[in-house]
Amino acid sequence: FLAGMAAGFVTGILHTFFGIPGILASILTQIGLYSVNLGIMGKSNQAVNVMQYKLVASLRYVTGEGSELFFVKLIVAALILIAIIYWFFGTELGASIRATGCNPQMASAQGINTGFTKVLALMISNGLVGLSGGIYAQYQGAADVNMGRGAIVIGLAAVIISEVIFAKFCAGRKAAFAFTLGAIFIGAIIYYIVIALVLWLKMPSDYMKLFSAVVVACF
């Protein structure tokens, strides 16, 4: 989580302090982190000894004994994370970040330091991405420098699917933001169900990226 926050801080500084466009700043950070990951791992891929370490998530927890308890813990952790995010974005600082994202010019006119809120938002989001990457590496039992490719497609798919399915349900409700956060998790689950269905139908795995794009386009 802290490593991800550091990456977000670098991206934010490149964008706000040096004036580099947001997309380019994120690409530059990603390119730099590729070499950093290689330096830390020593090679392009590294196995995680599941018997030596007590892991947060592992494939053996899903397929072995006590898998039901693991799924319960996973759901509880997701709900706690949603609650924390909802609480934070309801605070003055969180509202400032949301205002900056909606309309940075108006937020700046209201006296909000948009440079600070952008950096903070990038640090939080990248911290969550880093935490997710660490958990995913534990689950897979290995880490690879290329394993994060395509993650943006999954994230966008989760957001788009949740918006299409739950937009009318969340509109106008008092806790619409909380419902939206929960809907994103459900959207990600629906996306993976569709992908699992594609695999179950024994369609060529070489076209998995194409199937993913079609799923997002359909929604």
Where are these regions (language model features)?
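Membrane-embedded helix boundary and interhelical linker motif in transport proteins
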Residues: 1-17, 41, 60, 64, ...
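Helix-loop interface residues and adjacent transmembrane-helix termini in multi-pass membrane transporters
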Residues: 17-20, 116, 178, 200-202
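Structural signal for membrane-spanning alpha-helices in multi-pass inner-membrane proteins
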Residues: 12, 37-38, 81-89, 133-137, ...
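Helix-loop-helix "hairpin" substructures at the membrane interface of multi-pass membrane proteins
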Residues: 1, 7, 67-148, 152
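Alpha-helical transmembrane segments within multi-pass membrane transporters and channels
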Residues: 1-31, 36, 78-82, 186-187, ...
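Transmembrane alpha-helical segments in multi-pass inner-membrane proteins
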Residues: 129-210
